[in-house]
Design a protein with these regions (language model features):
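Polar, S/T/G-rich
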Residues: 116-123, 127, 151-163, 215, ...
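An acidic/polar, Gly/Ser/Thr-rich interaction patch typically located in mid-to-C-terminal regions
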Residues: 28-53, 202-357
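Short beta-strand-centered interaction patches in the first periplasmic/extracellular domains
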Residues: 91, 97-100, 137-206, 212
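Short, compositionally biased
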Residues: 77-86, 111, 183-185, 324-337
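Interface-prone segments of viral and bacterial extracellular assemblies
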Residues: 1-7, 11-13, 72, 96, ...
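Assembly/oligomerization scaffold segments
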Residues: 1-103
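Conserved "cap/hinge" positions at secondary-structure junctions
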Residues: 65-67, 180, 309, 315
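N-terminal export/assembly leaders
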Residues: 101-109, 121-148
Length: 357
C-alpha cells in the first residue's frame, strides 16, 4: 500500500512565509481559470483564540502547494480583495484574485481599428498595460478591416475578437495571451506539458456528451461578386488515414464525432471567401469544445495541472479513455480531508480542413 501522504503548502506575503498559518488552516482553495476570469484564492483560518491579525486589502500573497517531502508547486501571486470574519467558532476567510488582473482592465474606451492585423491590436493593448504579447502564429497575420470599440473595455473587446476567430485570450504571469484553445500548445506552437491520469480509489467523475452538439462540420456562404452568386465553404474534421489492420478500438475513437452529414449552417452571408472560412472554422471549434465534457475529482491532488494542458485518462469507459482531453479549469483544495484536485476537461479539438465547394 502507498504511504499516507500529507498535504503541504506555503503562503508568502511580500516574499516572506506567513508564520502560524499551518496550525490555523481550515481550508485553502485555488481555482485556475482560462479566459478573462481571474484565478481565485480562498483561505479560511481558525480564529477561535481571537489572536489573528486581519491582513490588509491589496496585500500580495504567493502560494505554493503540494505534498510533504516533495517540491511544492508555485501557483502564482494573488491580491487580497475581500476579507470576512464570522463565528462562533470564529474564523477568518481571505479571498484574493490573480495579480495579473487589474482594475484598469475594466476602463471603457473609444477606439476605432482600421486595416490592422490581430498582432497589431493585441500588441497595442498589451503595451498599454506593460504586458508581453503572446500570439498564436496562425492568428498573427489575420487582417481586421474595421472594428469599433465603443464604450467597451480592452478585455471585453479582446474577448469579442477572440470569439470571432475561435481563439481565447487571457493574462498569465505578465503575458497577454491570444491563442487557439484546445490544441494543447502555447502561443509559439510548442506543446504544453501533457498529463496522464489513471483512475484510483477515491476519485469521482462525471462524463457528458450531447448528440445535438456533435456536428461533423460547419458551412458558411460568401458572395462572389465576380460572378454575382453565392458560394459555400465547409470546414470539417480531417479524417485520419485508415489503418491497414482493423483494430477493435478504431470505431470507438469516432464516438464523439456526430452523425455523418450533421452540418451546422451559418445564416450570415460573408463578403469574401476568407471571412466565410474564418467564421466557419471559429464556429466549428466552438461546437467541438461543447460536444463532450468530463469532470473528475482526484482524491490525491496534483498541483502541477493547469488549464490548456492536454493528456489522457485511463480506467474509465473506453470512449473516455480513447479521447485526448484538454483541461478547461482546475481547482485545488487543501482541507481536513486532504488535498484534492477537481478538473473540468474538454475534448481536444481534432485537426480540420476547409473545402470550397
Amino acid at each position: 500500500t502507498d504511504p499516507v501522504k500529507m498535504p503541504d503548502f506555503d503562503i508568502l506575503a511580500e516574499g516572506k512565509t506567513l508564520s502560524g498559518v499551518a496550525e490555523r488552516l481550515m481550508s485553502l482553495s485555488l481555482t485556475d481559470n482560462r479566459g478573462f476570469e481571474a484565478d481565485q484564492l480562498t483561505i479560511t483560518l481558525d480564529d477561535a483564540d481571537g489572536q489573528l491579525q486581519l491582513p490588509p486589502r491589496g496585500a500580495r500573497l504567493t502560494v505554493l502547494i503540494g505534498w510533504k517531502g516533495e517540491p511544492l508547486t508555485e501557483k502564482g501571486t494573488y491580491i487580497v480583495d475581500e476579507i470576512a470574519h464570522e463565528g462562533p467558532p470564529d474564523r477568518l476567510t481571505v479571498s484574493a484574485r490573480s495579480a495579473d488582473f487589474r482594475d484598469e482592465f475594466n476602463v471603457k474606451r473609444e477606439v476605432s481599428w482600421h486595416d490592422v492585423t490581430v498582432e497589431r491590436v493585441v500588441s497595442a493593448i498589451a503595451h498599454r498595460y506593460g504586458l508581453k504579447p503572446q500570439i498564436s502564429e496562425m492568428l498573427m497575420d489575420i487582417e481586421i478591416d474595421h472594428a469599433d470599440q465603443t464604450e467597451e473595455s480592452d478585455m471585453s473587446f479582446l474577448t469579442r475578437m477572440a470569439e470571432m476567430l475561435g481563439a481565447i485570450t487571457t493574462v498569465k504571469s505578465g503575458n497577454l495571451l491570444f491563442i487557439m484553445p484546445g490544441g494543447g500548445v502555447n502561443a509559439q506552437g510548442q506543446p504544453l506539458p501533457s498529463f496522464a491520469i489513471t483512475r484510483s480509489s477515491g476519485d469521482r467523475h462525471q462524463f457528458r456528451i450531447a448528440d445535438r452538439e456533435a456536428y461533423t462540420g460547419v458551412r458558411a456562404y460568401w458572395l462572389d461578386l465576380n460572378y454575382g452568386k453565392k458560394k459555400k465553404v465547409s470546414v470539417k474534421r480531417r479524417k485520419p488515414p485508415k489503418p491497414k489492420k482493423e483494430k477493435s478500438s478504431s470505431r470507438e475513437g469516432d464516438y464523439m464525432e456526430g452523425a455523418e452529414g450533421n452540418v451546422f449552417v451559418l445564416r450570415k452571408t460573408y463578403q469574401n471567401e476568407q471571412a466565410a472560412r474564418r467564421a466557419a472554422a471559429a464556429k466549428w471549434q466552438q461546437l467541438q469544445r461543447g460536444a463532450a465534457s468530463f469532470s473528475i475529482t482526484l482524491a490525491r491532488g496534483r498541483a502541477e495541472l493547469y488549464p490548456e494542458m492536454h493528456g489522457t485518462v485511463t480506467g474509465f469507459k473506453s470512449e473516455i479513455d480513447n479521447q485526448d482531453w484538454i483541461i478547461a479549469k482546475a481547482e485545488h483544495t487543501i482541507d481536513n480531508s486532504g488535498f484534492t484536485t477537481q478538473l473540468e476537461l474538454e475534448a481536444k479539438i481534432p485537426e480540420w480542413i476547409a473545402e470550397t465547394d
